[in-house]
Amino acid sequence: MWKGLIHQYKEFLPVTDQTPALTLHEGNTPLIHLPKLSEQLGIELHVKTEGVNPTGSFKDRGMVMAVAKAKEEGNDTIMCASTGNTSAAAAAYAARANMKCIVIIPNGKIAFGKLAQAVMYGAEIIAIDGNFDDALKIVRSICEKSPIALVNSVNPYRIEGQKTAAFEVCEQLGEAPDVLAIPVGNAGNITAYWKGFKEYHEKNGTGLPKMRGFEAEGAAAIVRNEVIENPETIATAIRIGNPASWDKAVKAAEESNGKIDEVTDDEILHAYQLIARVEGVFAEPGSCASIAGVLKQVKSGEIPKGSKVVAVLTGNGLKDPNTAVDISEIKPVTLPTDEDSILEYVKGAARV
């Protein structure tokens, strides 16, 4: 029986006898093969579906470690800045650990599903007029001056927890893929995966992938090599103009002979709809930067035909239902409450 990441991977994690056995049974997420897209693209494409984690995103992996260590160190309050998923994970694990959680969010820039989670888990929520980068700056300053644990990805325990996804990919495939494609926002996750692949390879000889990270064009600070003061993208989860793990992400790409690239909002939305309608996988828009990047780089030849590719889908599609409804051409059809009318419509729709 799966007992969570701290139990499963304790030999790889900085835990002690005093570390609480905190868990919501995070991790152990499916690696789903996409046969139709694999055939279309001429590659072997799989998706690591992190949206099935307890709060619906990959953030649970790092948060269980960050909160457990904060508890071990005697803190009773945690704090974070968030575009949504971090706040949901922080609030959930704080509730589980009987701790207080304070989150700062950019006002009006957080997907509804994520805000609802933070509210239900009991977080203290502060909205500011600035963006995520402004929020993180404030949180870091407050945590330096107060006995409050910072649980954003600048917290090294977050990276430790998140690296476990790379272990799972290797276990599920039997080896590392040729390419690991991943969205890049605050850049902690690409950093964590690369750390995980290196550690697992050192112990088990599973090989190392090329790390290919994808920023949204309107928030592509690393690609442009400049801080973006007012980042804008449909992909709210990666709407970050000054990534906290910038240097480490660049290092991960360089060490692995990979690349940090950018994709447009149109490319993200195309990928978002494509994997849902062709493969039955529903991920939030920010997640789909990885798929958009794979499509782009297969077309350019940067990802060779025949490659074994894992694209990380970082969050569940239900995190951002408004985007799904807003962009869909498929709208409910209103008909009379009459079987004959409905049958006639169904015959036309089904072409029977």
Swiss-Prot record:
Q: Any idea what job this protein has? A: Catalyzes the gamma-elimination of phosphate from L-phosphohomoserine and the beta-addition of water to produce L-threonine.
Query: What EC class does the entry list?
Result: lyase
Record's NCBIfam families?
thrC
Gene Ontology biological process terms in this record = cysteine biosynthetic process; threonine biosynthetic process
Record-listed pyridoxal 5'-phosphate binding positions:
N85, G185, N186, A187, G188, N189, T314
- Alphabetical keyword list: Amino-acid biosynthesis, Lyase, Pyridoxal phosphate, Threonine biosynthesis
Chain positions with N6-(pyridoxal phosphate)lysine modification: K59
Please give the superkingdom of this protein's source: Bacteria
Look up the record and name the pathway of this protein: Amino-acid biosynthesis; L-threonine biosynthesis; L-threonine from L-aspartate: step 5/5
Q: Which GO terms fall under molecular function for this chain's record?
A: pyridoxal phosphate binding; threonine synthase activity
Q: Which residues form a coiled coil?
A: none
Keyword Metal-binding among record annotations: no
Which SUPFAM superfamilies does this UniProt record tie to the protein?
A: Tryptophan synthase beta subunit-like PLP-dependent enzymes
Output the Gene Ontology cellular-component terms: cytoplasm
Query: According to the UniProt entry, what is the EC number of this protein?
Result: 4.2.3.1
Q: Which family does it belong to?
A: Belongs to the threonine synthase family.
Reaction(s) the record says it catalyses: O-phospho-L-homoserine + H2O = L-threonine + phosphate
Which species is listed as the source? Bacillus subtilis (strain 168)
What's the cofactor?
Answer: pyridoxal 5'-phosphate
Q: What is this protein called?
A: Threonine synthase
